[in-house]
Structure formats: C-alpha cells, structure tokens
Amino acid sequence: MAPLKVHGPVRMRSMQTGITKWKEGSFEIVEKDNKVSLVVHYNVGGIPKTFQLSHNIKSVTLRPNGRKLCCLMLTLKDTSFLTIDKVPLKDANEMRMYLDAVHQDRVHTAGKPSQGSGSFGGVLGSRTTQKEANRQFSYIENQAPPKRVTVESKDETPFRKVLGTPARASVKNSSGTGAPSNRVNVAASPTSSVPHRTGLLESRSEKRKRAQPPSSEMSEDYPKENDSSTNNTAMSDPAWKYLNSSREKQLKLKQEEENRTSGVLPLQSSSYYGSRSSSKEYSTSSSTLDRSSVSSQTTSAKRSLGFLSQPAPLSVKKMRSNQDYTGWNKPRVPLSTHPQQQLQGFSNLGNTCYMNAILQSLFSIQSFANDLLKQGIPWKKIPLNALIRRFAHLLAKKDVSSPEVKKELLKKVKSAISATAERFSGYMQNDAHEFLSQCLDQLKEDMEKLNKTWKSEPVPNDDSSPGRASDDLSATKVYTCPVISNLEFEVQHSIICKTCGETVTKREQFNDLSIDLPRRKKLFPSRSIQDSLDLFFRAEEIEYSCEKCNGKSAVVTHKFNRLPRVLILHLKRYSFNVALSLNHKVGQQVVIPRYLTLLSHCTESTRLPLTLGWSAHSAISRPLKASQMVNSCTISTSTPCRKGRFLRKEGLSELRSSTGRKNLNRVHVFKEDVQDINSSLQVQRGIRKSSKRSKMEGDKPELGNAGFDGMSEDELLAAVLEISKREASLSLSHDEDKPTSSPDTGFGDDEIQELPENLETMETEKPKAPLESGPANFTEITKDFDENKENKTPEGSQGEVDWLQQYDMEREREEQELQQALAQSLQEQEAREQKEDDDLKRATELSLQEFNSSLLDSVGSDEDSGNEDVLDMEYSEAEAEELKRNAETGELPHSYRLISIVSHIGSTSSSGHYISDVYDIKKQSWFTYNDLEVSRTLETTVQCDRDRSGYIFFYMHKDIFDELLETEKNAQPLSMEVGRSIRQPL
C-alpha cells in the first residue's frame, strides 16, 4: 500500500520558489477527481506547496542513505525537483511504486478501492479517525446546504483536503454495489448509502429554518456529496432544485441587508454577484470546481463557522483565488511595489550570476554612477561594442526598463567583455573576482582611448589668437575615469636595508586588494576583515641585495599613498591542493565589521580620496588659466596631460592624419541637393571676405601680409578656412552635443530606444539638420579636399561640384560594401546565437546538477585557512579595544563603511551561486540581489549570514558616505517617508 505521508528533511527546486534550504517536513499524496497531487508540508508551519503529479512526473529516484534509510528524489516535467531525505526504506519503496504507477498512467487502478488491493483511496479512508469523522459530521449538520459553492475559499490552506476527498471517491464507487453502511455517524463514510444522505437533506432543511448562517461561506462539504456526478436522485429532482434556489436567494437578500448596515456592502455585493453567476445547473465541469473549492477549506474555518459575521476577508481572497489558479507557488509582485520599478534584479543568462552580483555592487556606488553618466561623455564617439558604452547604457536603463529589455542589455555587456576575454564568452560558471578585475581594467582602457581620441580632435590656436582661452579649454578636455576616481588607489612599497638603512621606494596602483584569511585560533574569537587587512600591510623581512652595502636582507613596508573613495577587498577563500589537483573552498568564519580603519597603514603624506565635485577637466583647466600652457602635471586620469603648444606644420599634418577618417565620416551627414551646396558655397565666400578683413587687421602675426602675398589662391583658401574652423570649433562642439545628450546620462533619445544592433549603428550616423552643418563642417570638407593632392581641382564652383560627384560614387561603393558586410554579419550572428542557445541549455543543466550536489556539502569548512606560514596579527589590549569600538562607530581617521558584499554559496569555484547584498543610499536600506529576485534585508542579517560565504567586500570612505547620505536626506526629505510606506511589502 502506498503510504499517505512520509516524513524527513525536505528540499524543493522550482521556477517559482528557486532552491530552498533543507527543512523538516513531509510529502503527502492527495487524490481527487482522478487527479493525483503531492502536498509538501513543513513542520514549522506555513502554506503547504502543492504539485500536480498526473501526467507531470518525469522520473522517480531512490538513493540509499544509511541503514534502512534512503533519499527519495522526484523530478517533474515542469522543471520542479523535490527531495525528501532520511525516509524509512519500506515507506520510500511503497511511495515510489505508487509514483511509478502514476507516471505510467495507471492512476485509475491505483486510486480505485477494492478488497485486497493496495488502493490509495482505501488508505486515505482508513486513516480518517473516529474523532475527525464525528467533528466533520457535526459541522455538516450545522451548516445550510447552498445551491452552489463559490470559489471564495480556493485560496485557503488545504489542511483538511484528505478528509473529504477519499470519502467522495468511495461513495461514488460503492453506491453502485450497494455496500451496507457500517458507520452511520460519519457523513463522508466510504460505505454511506444514498437513502441515508437523503435523510440528512431533510434534517438539514429543518435546521436551516431555525438557524440561517451565511451559506456561501459556511457550507462546502455538503454540495460535494450531492454532486451530479454521483447517483443521488434527490438532487436530480427539478422541483427540489427550484425550492432550494428560492430559499438561497431569500437568504442572500437578507444577509445583504444585514451587511449593508455594517458597512461591508461593496465586498458583500461582490460576493453575492459572484455566487449568482455560478447558479446554473450542476454539470461535470461545475462539480469539478466545487470539489476543488471545497478541498481547500481549512480546519480553522470548519471549527469557527459561527463567528464568521463579516465575509470581507473571504471576499478579498476570492479575488486573489483567480490569480492563484496555477498554484500557490507562483510569484506575484504586490500592487504596492509596481511603482518602485528600481527594485528589480538582472536575469540569469545561463550561469551569469557572477556577472549580476558584480554589476549590482558596482552600480550601487553612487559616485561611480555619477562619474559615468553625468559628466557629458560623448557616447556617439565611442564604438558600439565598447564596454563603457554598454556599461553606461545598462546603468541608465536598469531602474526604468522591463526585465526583457535589461536582459538584452546584459547580453551586450557580456558580449563586450567576451570580445576581450574569451573565457567569459560561454555559459560556464566563472569567478566573480576575475570578472570584476576584467571589467575594471577594460573600463579604464576604454576611457583612455576616449581621452586620446578627444585630445586629437580640436585644433589649438597660437598664443596671440583671439578666443585662445576657450580653445585651450576645449583642447584640454579630459573625461574622468570612474574607475580611477572611485576605486583606484596607490600603495608605496619601501624596501629598507637592514645593514645600512638604504631605502628604495616603489609605487603601485591597485583597483582592489586580495587579502588572506587570518589564521583561526580555537581558543580565541573569530578573526575579522580588519585582521586580514592588517595582515596584508604588515612589515615582512625578505632576501635583498643592497647596491650600497651589499647587504643580503631587508624589510618591506607597505603604506597607502593615495586613498580611494571605495575600497574593494577580495577575501581568498579558495585553496588549491596540488597533490589532489582540487580547488577547495574554505568556509572559515570571518567577522564582517561595519567600519574598517586604514589609520595604521597611512602616513602624513597620504592623499585623501578625491572629493565628489572633482573632475579631471577642472583639474587641468585651472592651471591653464594661470600659465596658459601645460608643461607637466600629475592628475588622476587614465591619460597623460595634453601639451599646451603645437608646432604649426607638424601639428597640422598630425591632426589631419589622425582625423582623416573621421572627417570622411562627417561628410556622410550632408545632404546632396543643390540648394545645400550653393548655400554652403555662399557661406564659404562670406568667410573668405571676413578672413581677409581679419588679415588686414593683423590678428594673426604668423599669417601676416607677407605670408599672404606669397601664397597662391589655393594655399590662401586653405589658410583662411583653417582660421574660420578655429573660431567655430568651440561652438560646433556645443551644438553637436546639445541635441543628442541628456543632462543626466548623456544618452539621447535614440540611445534610449531599444533597437537591434544594425539599426543602432544606422541611428548613430543619421543626418543632422542643415542648420547644424554650418560653415565649420563645410570647412572640414574643403580641408580634406586640400589635403588630398590627387583631388585638387582649379578654383571655381564647378570643380567643387565635380569633387562632390566623385565623392558620391565613393560613398555609394561604401554603402554597398556596408550592406554586404551587414548581411554577412547577420548570418554569422544567427549561427552564433543558435550555438549560444545550445551551449546555454547544456550549461544550465550541468550547473543545476553541480549546484544540487554542492548544496549537500555547502555547510562550509570551519578548519584553518591553511596559511600555516603566515604570521597572525597581534594587538595590544588597548589596540584591540579601540578597533572593536571603531568597527561600530567609525570614529578613527581614514575609516571606511561597509556598502556591499558579493557572496558565493557553494563548495567549489566551478559550481555554486553568487548573490550580492547592497546598501542603497537613496533608500537608506539593505537589499539582497539574487539574480532577478530582490528582497529587503537588515545590515545585522547580512553581517551574520555572510560570515562564511562573503567573498568580495566593498567599503566606502566614511566622509564620502556621510556626504552622499546627507545630500540624499536634504534632497528628498518627504519622498523618502512616502517611499518607505510604499515599499514596506518588500
């Protein structure tokens, strides 16, 4: 016989709930309406989880687990995976046999009760005790028989589901055989006969006349017995139906009048009309609905029916029951959280949890986000597949876009990184710290390329030219690298000879620090992140050959030379066993303090983090105004400083060679109609006249009268156009950026639109308005024309028109080549996407298998970190007390505040799962990002739960943190109070 229940530790995995932890509970099989379901109960309480088994079982597996115990694993076709451990072998075998019968579609034979057969219905019937049967009979007698059962109780917890279900099955199967009634005091007895139930109808009608409780919510078992699918002749009588319907209508009207006086009319009327809509003749489909609704009634509702005077809560649940039709496990965002779209995570593209966790932690750094989006970076000038462009686009859209849109942006970010680091191109699990390092290095390279390209674009004037200050300002435009200004810091290593004291210093830049786990002492409390950091900066003795005295030993010290805004610490939790070739994760407990201090690792010359208002452009422009040139300076940017002077001939030729391709691209934006050409020629003639007047006034000493007199007309035209371009360069750059950049993000309207890759490429090159392509742009065409000696033509408009016609032919050829390249690229992209989809499916299945196996061993080792050769930090009693106090208050100088943790759940680096805990300064609350799922949490919970799995820690300088926090409090004093009440359900 298949057992009714099996007990043991339970774990589930489904699309709705994810992977749960091991909890004590039970598996219970419920059979109703020829359908079999599995109900999972937890000993700690809560809503049971129901899984349909009919036509949904994929496999059933038994795995021995000790003596006379085993583990039962059930895999469903809807990707759900259920496991119960430590089950007695006999019970597990019986349940497996029953599940195999359901899997082989033999549930009708397994569910019919017959003498001597191991029927499930017989088991359920026999498990109903006399006490429960009497209670059920007492309840049924005190309720009024309704005409129709509403679905108001579908959302209730099905604790008593088993009691009613086997009784109905037994009645239906035994009524035809005429089995004698042995248990007349049980209303739902398997051997109850039809005449006995008819007598119950009469007694219930008399009781209903004396006491009239709300029938739509208090009577639910009775219609199940009187269902039309049974052989009950009393209910098939039309006269009985008519009388019962009339009585029900009178009861409803009377109850509506009573509830109207109590102020619950809207909910009651909703319930009333809901019941009227279902008052049709009984049929097979309606009986199925009645059974499903009755089976979900709770025990508490059956025991306290006399106190249900206000049906408002049930009416609300009735509205929710329609949404819960597919099961209680379906995740549904509360209505109050819909306006808060920023509380969304990132979709897992296939083992990309490492990427999602790192991105959420980086995006939570407000100063990093501001430096990336709000300094006016010319995104149009950056290649489409550059990581910094993809990175900024995702950051700008993450709080305002749907998960589908963000999923496409995530794919683009992954593609941009995979183009440089192929190890991230597939769908295998990767290390989060490796991804972080690659991401930061690639962002710095992109900013360096941008600054180098931007440096060569404007043409500088000489010292005596008008508008020189504005041109110098444009020429020295340097964009701030978000990585350098926020995350990069500098450490000075000092090697001191122990013999003669000779000191050799070396400076090194870091984006993060990889610190060792401190050695755990069994007699002392657990070590902290502060101990690991101090361990990294401890002085150590090395073998060193001194050039001065030929000494053989020296001491190395490490001190901060420049502090970062945000300090990233990578805790080395993995140790590689060379003998076994295994990568083992050390689950040693490490205390996570709220504040760290770098006081003992700084000197008097240590530079503080950059202020929030700092920018590389302002750092260069200020000394320019005093000296009018930049000879040498040291700034925290990814590019060297730009020189203030350019040689006239060499600088011009270098500029032309570096911007030749860009000028050709700019020509694409011009229209080709004759009116625009003629208007441009007229503007050119006007510029020529004005430039001659400026020549007579002596504005350019190096282009004096003697110089112009010795020039030909072609050379004169080139010189004059060069002057006009300098005068219009600043205004042109402003006009270009103004319509395409937003003040907050720098992305224009076309960037915000989600377009395919080829459409986005075309969007960046669409023509501008004729008003924006003024004389300065036309001078660039003429300059290219003058630069190319093969294309020189005699003076006159006809020669220029011939040149434009020749350029039209070149452009048509380029467009044809572009179309061919796009077609080939699309074919390659389709093939690549198909291959990626196949790889994704295989990788997902492999990852789930590895993750399930790793969870069994994911408790974590509490052994020593294996750093036997590493000395432990020793503090005096006063120092230890001071560090302990600072960990909570941050009162010491150079303190850093915890703002994010990236944790790894699993036993090896090749499997497991990454999540991130982030402190949101705007909301002043902690959130846990688990791929697409976001939940609110507490800082103490984060510190406690991540002490064995914390992998990467983000700490922000206390002064920067306090400044950002104060800014948010002053900016939104009222909205934050409203926001807290709205976001409370999270």
Curated annotation (Swiss-Prot):
A motif (D-box 1) lies at residues 71-79. A motif (KEN box 2) lies at residues 224-226. Its EC number is 3.4.19.12. Residues 712-731, 813-832, 835-854 form the UIM domain. Keywords: Cell cycle, Cell division, Hydrolase, Mitosis, Protease, Repeat, Thiol protease, Ubl conjugation pathway. The active site is at 353 (nucleophile), 913 (proton acceptor). Residues 149-159, 251-260, 729-739, 829-840 have a biased composition (Basic and acidic residues). One of its GO terms (molecular function) is cysteine-type endopeptidase activity. A motif (KEN box 3) lies at residues 789-791. Residues 269-298, 818-828 have a biased composition (Low complexity). A motif (D-box 2) lies at residues 96-105. Residues 171-195 have a biased composition (Polar residues). One of its GO terms (biological process) is protein K48-linked deubiquitination. A motif (D-box 3) lies at residues 160-168. It holds the Pfam family UIM. The keyword Cytoplasm does not apply. Residues 134-238, 251-305, 683-710, 729-751, 811-840 are annotated as: Disordered. It catalyses: Thiol-dependent hydrolysis of ester, thioester, amide, peptide and isopeptide bonds formed by the C-terminal Gly of ubiquitin (a 76-residue protein attached to proteins as an intracellular targeting signal). InterPro entries: Papain-like_cys_pep_sf, Peptidase_C19, Peptidase_C19_UCH, UIM_dom, USP37-like_PH, USP37-like_PH_sf, USP_CS, USP_dom. A motif (KEN box 1) lies at residues 32-34. GO terms for cellular component: cytosol; nucleus. Deubiquitinase that antagonizes the anaphase-promoting complex (APC/C) during G1/S transition by mediating deubiquitination of APC/C target proteins, thereby promoting S phase entry. Specifically mediates deubiquitination of 'Lys-11'-linked polyubiquitin chains, a specific ubiquitin-linkage type mediated by the APC/C complex. This is Ubiquitin carboxyl-terminal hydrolase 37. It comes from Gallus gallus (Chicken). The lineage of its organism: Eukaryota, Metazoa, Chordata, Craniata, Vertebrata.
